Design a protein with these regions (language model features):
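Helical transmembrane-bundle signal
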Residues: 23-34, 50-60, 84-94, 120-127, ...
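Alpha-helical transmembrane segments of polytopic membrane proteins
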Residues: 20, 43-53, 116-117, 167
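Juxtamembrane membrane-water interface segments of multi-pass membrane proteins
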Residues: 1-19, 32-42, 60-78, 96-111, ...
Length: 174
């Protein structure tokens, strides 16, 4: 959805394809070796592949943002940018947790879970909702009236000031 919402096009998909395959091999490997004992070496290999896949994904997102036509970030894209930054931070923290004795650092794993759920997933969902929900409401309510009478723009479907307040409150909460 990010290329559509940022009006990006004409960018290579090499990093996206690499991210897809590397991430899936890493996830399949991790889920397979968890059923066996003495797989520490493979655990580190597959964890590294997962991290590498996320890095390629974030590089692809960066390329998409560099090729955008819209220079100004609207509120939905701002939420998404913060979500991807949080994904990068949680990847760093997750890598650290994976390679140390995390059972002695219980609070660190709680922080990691909080960052994933509220920093990455929630921010991304809210950001995409600011793009999708106004369109769906507009389409349902006003699409039949286009050309017959004045209809509001998509940006008029929600209060930008309240959205900015929500954005900063969510960042503060995370």
């Amino acid at each position: 959805l990010i290329p559509m919402f940022t009006l990006s096009h004409g960018f290579p998909l090499t990093n996206a394809k690499l991210a897809f395959w590397i991430l899936n091999v890493g996830l399949l490997g991790i889920s397979t070796i968890m059923h066996y004992k003495d797989t520490t070496f493979l655990y580190y290999i597959f964890t590294g592949l997962i991290v590498l896949g996320i890095i390629f994904f974030l590089l692809q997102i960066r390329i998409i943002f560099k090729n955008r036509i819209r220079n100004k970030y609207d509120i939905g894209i701002k939420f998404s940018v913060v979500a991807y930054l949080m994904l990068g931070l949680t990847t760093i923290l997750g890598t650290f947790i994976a390679f140390v004795d995390y059972q002695n650092i219980i609070n660190l794993t709680l922080i990691y879970g909080y960052m994933i759920i509220f920093g990455y997933i929630s921010m991304l969902i809210v950001g995409q909702m600011y793009k999708i929900v106004p369109f769906l409401v507009w389409y349902h309510k006003y699409s039949s009236k286009v050309g017959l009478e004045p209809v509001p723009m998509l940006k008029d479907m929600f209060n930008e000031k309240f959205a900015q307040i929500e954005f900063y409150l969510m960042i503060t909460a995370v």
